[in-house]
């Protein structure tokens, strides 16, 4: 790679979702939940086929692409997921608090307890704090906060 380029990185996740979940009511629930809990916003799908729900997660190049599928949609074992990194444990807790508030009005929301572990990368130890949230799509979302351990 040239010095001015950056390593390839993930910029979106595309998931085929049961079309029954993606009807008008379901799309509204998905948009409301992911907007309220994560702050994601709906993107323009006017040039896309199949009427996907596009949720921008931060910038134009970072999004979740949910495509309605009648026959062949994603089915996953429990806890298959994708992860998002948060800036602090406090931010993670704020997201979890919003998810718990939403869960009170919609019991389909699932949330795991917050966990923590030590992990190693390039001869350094890090503290990884995480929790998982699920709502209507086949994959859970893992929230992660990683910080360098200074107590070792």
What is each model feature region?
Residues 1-23, 74-152:
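Vicinal oxygen chelate
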Residues 15-63:
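Core segments of cupin and vicinal oxygen chelate
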Residues 17-19, 68-70, 118:
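Short, well-ordered turn and helix-capping elements at secondary-structure junctions
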Residues 20-22, 60, 71-73, 89-91, ...:
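Generic "edge-of-domain/loop-turn" microfeature
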Residues 23-25, 65, 92-94, 143, ...:
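Short acidic, gly/pro-rich beta-turn/loop elements at beta-sheet edges
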Residues 43, 49-87, 91:
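A short, hydrophobic/aromatic-rich structural module that often spans a beta strand
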């Amino acid at each position: 790679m040239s010095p001015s380029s950056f390593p390839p990185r993930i910029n979106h996740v595309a998931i085929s979702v049961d079309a029954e979940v993606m009807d008008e009511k379901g799309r509204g629930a998905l948009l409301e939940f992911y907007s309220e809990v994560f702050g994601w916003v709906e993107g323009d799908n006017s040039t896309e086929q199949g009427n996907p729900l596009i949720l921008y997660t931060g910038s134009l190049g970072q999004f979740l692409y949910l495509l309605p599928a009648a026959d062949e949609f994603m089915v996953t074992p429990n806890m298959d997921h994708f992860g998002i990194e948060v800036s602090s444990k406090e931010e993670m807790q704020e997201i979890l608090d919003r998810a718990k508030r939403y869960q009170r009005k919609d019991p389909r929301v699932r949330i795991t307890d917050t966990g923590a572990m030590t992990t190693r990368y390039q001869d350094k130890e890090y503290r990884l704090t995480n929790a998982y949230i699920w709502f209507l799509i086949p994959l859970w979302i893992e929230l992660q906060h990683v910080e360098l351990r200074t107590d070792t």
